[in-house]
Curated annotation (Swiss-Prot):
It comes from the Bacteria. InterPro entries: UCP032146. It holds the Pfam family UPF0262. HAMAP family: UPF0262. The lineage of its organism: Bacteria, Pseudomonadati, Pseudomonadota, Alphaproteobacteria, Hyphomicrobiales. Belongs to the UPF0262 family. NCBIfam families: PRK02853.1 (NF002769). This is UPF0262 protein RHE_CH00582.
């Protein structure tokens, strides 16, 4: 363990929930790949990683179980999903519109829907970053990728 190496080296989603649609699974795979490639993940009060993160749902709560690269327990944080419900619902609705639009809509229509999708995704990312404050310090890009994974879990669950 390198002191100050505040990054994720592995991310696992609760696989007991099952798989989703090919589009959602693609989003999951891309988010995990991008997250591992570049992230800032600092569990407060811990000297450094890299870290392994298991994200799951338990009793309608979001669970972040953090371990060291070697598997030692670091922390488990449980967050209420309530602040995310509206954002995730809106995000799913606009994603459905986006996936429909890319099949038949004009480029300007697709771009407009995509801008709305990114705006809602940014809102969810900031909400997640705020909810993790005081527990885990993350940058905005890391929060974006983590929010994508929260949506995947929500979609499956």
């Amino acid at each position: 363990m390198a002191a100050g190496d505040f990054r994720l080296c592995d991310v696992v989603l609760d696989d007991t929930i099952g798989r989703s649609t090919p589009d959602v699974e693609h989003e999951r795979a891309v988010a995990i790949f991008d997250l591992i490639e570049e992230n800032r993940f600092e569990p407060l009060g811990h000297s450094g990683g890299p870290y392994r993160l298991n994200i799951s749902l338990m009793d309608s709560k979001l669970v972040f179980a953090i371990k060291t690269e070697e598997g030692g327990d670091v922390a488990t944080h449980i967050l209420s999903l309530t602040p995310f419900r509206r954002i995730v619902k809106d995000y799913f609705m606009i994603c459905e519109s986006y996936y429909e639009a890319i099949r038949s809509a004009t480029p300007s229509r697709i771009e407009a829907i995509d801008m709305g999708r990114r705006g809602i995704h940014n809102e969810g990312s900031q909400t997640l970053k705020d909810r993790l404050a005081g527990k885990i310090e993350v940058d905005f890009d890391t929060a974006r990728r983590l929010f994508t994974l929260v949506c995947v879990l929500y979609w499956r669950g």
